[in-house]
Amino acid sequence: MTAQNENAQAQAEQVEVANEAQLEQTAEIQQEQPVEAELAAAYARINELETYVAEADNREKDIQLRAQAEIQNIRRRAEQDVEKAHKFALEKFSKELLTVVDNLERGLNALDTAVTDEKTQALVDGVEMTHKEFISTLAKFGVEAVGVVGEAFNPEVHEAISMQPAEGIEANHISVVLQKGYTLQGRVLRPAMVMVAG
């Protein structure tokens, strides 16, 4: 029986060693599982934070680009406002000068019929030179006359007083200019008052 006891005891020891080894493996696995779970949670949190940082960077870049675009728009608008102010600063002054031009032209028309001698002709020539110089000076500052007989009617720069048939002039073209119109840098100062061929 001793050999059997020894065998039984050896088997019991082997079973006990196997049980201990199995318990150690189970303990190691149980220890590794919480570590792996914590590690997986930590990696998930890291990924989440990296995504948040990337989105924050994108938001910051977007805000910066929008701010730069807004600054450029404000700068461009300010430049346009200054340009318009320079361009049209003379508008009121130019409108007042148009009355002077009209009166000079009326005076010239009246003098043309009243010329009787050389002295009167010299006066007419002087007034004509003054008129031409005045028109030239206005043109230097962007004031241009509009409304010529035979020109196509344009409601943006012409004001039609009436329509009537006219020989040698196409329909919807100016037949008579009652008062010249003027523009300043392309903007209408005063529309031309005209009669249109019908």
UniProtKB/Swiss-Prot annotation:
Transmembrane domains' residue ranges: none
Subcellular location: Cytoplasm
One GO cellular component, as annotated: cytosol
Keywords: Chaperone, Cytoplasm, Stress response
Quaternary context: Homodimer.
Family annotation (NCBIfam families): PRK14140.1 (NF010738), PRK14150.1 (NF010748)
Family of the protein in this entry: Belongs to the GrpE family.
Function: Participates actively in the response to hyperosmotic and heat shock by preventing the aggregation of stress-denatured proteins, in association with DnaK and GrpE. It is the nucleotide exchange factor for DnaK and may function as a thermosensor. Unfolded proteins bind initially to DnaJ; upon interaction with the DnaJ-bound protein, DnaK hydrolyzes its bound ATP, resulting in the formation of a stable complex. GrpE releases ADP from DnaK; ATP binding to DnaK triggers the release of the substrate protein, thus completing the reaction cycle.
Protein name: Protein GrpE
Source organism (scientific name): Actinobacillus pleuropneumoniae serotype 5b (strain L20)
Lineage: Bacteria, Pseudomonadati, Pseudomonadota, Gammaproteobacteria, Pasteurellales
Gene: grpE
